[in-house]
Amino acid sequence: QIIGDIPIYVAMDSADAWAHPELFQLDQDNVPLAVAGCPPDGFSATGQLWGNPLYRWDYHRNTGYQWWISRMSYCFRLYDVVRIDHFRGFDEYFSIPYGDKDARGGHWEKGPGIDLFRKIEQALGWKQVIAEDLGYMTDSVRHLVYESGFPGMKVLEFAFDSRDSGCASDYLPHNYPENCVAYTGTHDNETIVGWWKSITAAERKLARDYLCDHARSEER
């Protein structure tokens, strides 16, 4: 099977934003009112300013999500499985005023939630979707992933952080739920070789101890 990847957002200079400005939060001159990104966190003190135009979810809802249905339908003509990047944005999305230099002035807005995916399923039938649910997660995001029935993601490279205690990491294989897809890494990660060379000696020991212990358990 072929797994295709689509982002939640499109670019400001995309054909979609040009042909259908009514789908996005734009002013009368088609200038964004706000843009997408992520809030400040432990990795970036100023957050992430992506700059994509945000959706007018009220308009999408009133049109029965036809644009999204068309988008997903086309993707399934190309792929057997579709992974949706930044799935948490369907629960809540981060809105940053247009013109800001970083993401510190942004705030969370409510997304369409499960309603979007119910409408897609009604139109297209059940389809295989992977929900990219990495990063900042809340109970409401986890509930949306659960309610959708889509498998979430687990990334092995995240499992051996020396700051985590014991075997508590959600990314350790023995903690995986049944409904998930496991990756060694994603497009945002190092290759396995690059990752192995970049981690600390303590983290390499964690990985060796864990993987060797589980290999011995399998042999028994």
Give the positions of each predicted feature.
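Alpha-amylase-like alpha-glycosidases and glucanotransferases acting on alpha-linked glucans and related
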Residues: 1, 9-218
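Ligand-binding beta-strand-loop-alpha-helix segment within the catalytic cores
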Residues: 5
